Amino acid sequence: MSAAAGVMKPEYGPSVPRLLAPRWRAASGPAKAAATAAAVALVALLLAAGLTLENAAYSHGGNAPFSFEYRGLYRTTPDRGEYMKAVSRWPDGSLKYEFAVGPLALPRYRDEVSAELALYATGFIRSLREEYPKFSLRAEGKTKINNTLTGYEVAFFTDVEGREMYARDVLLTPPEAHPREGVLVTMLTAPGASSQVGSPLEVGETGVLLRPLKSFAFG
């Protein structure tokens, strides 16, 4: 761009920065700090909003390597023991969706893995009751995730960050004989986040959490 092109034409009047400059110079230190903080927060919000619109993928190695795709979520710091966590929040900052993956370790067993997962779920549900004071079990049982994976689900109501949530945890293992290691998939959806999700059993069956769950694969 030439120098002439960069000059504001007189008929357009002064630029916005030139109009605001006197007020900025006259503003107090705390006012400037507050304005700067607000600008930084706005930029962070816009970046987060942009990231949620992009297709993304996550993969993890180890003895039970896995991968999945997601969209409409942005990665955040996982809780202790988790491999990965991605969330979406309402404009007021409250939790809207969450998809997290952590390790699953099974003891030695002789029966089919489906039977072992059902036994494991007994203690797992007990730990959920201890973790969530407002835990209310909706259902549990075998569930088919996609064409290659079948797991065991625990669907329940609970409160997270002070608000009611629909929750669905899925215990998954690789499709092999007597696996000992797998993953725990944790999914949360706020009531009202999706018109198609009206109970914990529908979490991950439609909407934002459908993609990461249905694209989940071991190997």
Model regions and ranges:
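Second-shell loop/turn segments in exported
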Residues: 107-114, 140, 196-203
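N-terminal intrinsically disordered, acidic low-complexity segments at the extreme N-terminus
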Residues: 1-23
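A short, amphipathic edge element
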Residues: 130-138
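Ser/Thr/Pro/Gly-rich low-complexity linker/stalk segments immediately outside membranes or between
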Residues: 24, 50-72
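Short, well-structured beta-strand
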Residues: 145-219
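Secretory pathway targeting signatures of secreted, lumenal, and periplasmic proteins
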Residues: 64-123, 157-164
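Short, hydrophobic/aromatic-rich segments at coil-to-beta transitions
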Residues: 55-59, 81-85, 146-156
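Hydrophobic membrane-insertion alpha-helices, especially the h-region
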Residues: 25-52
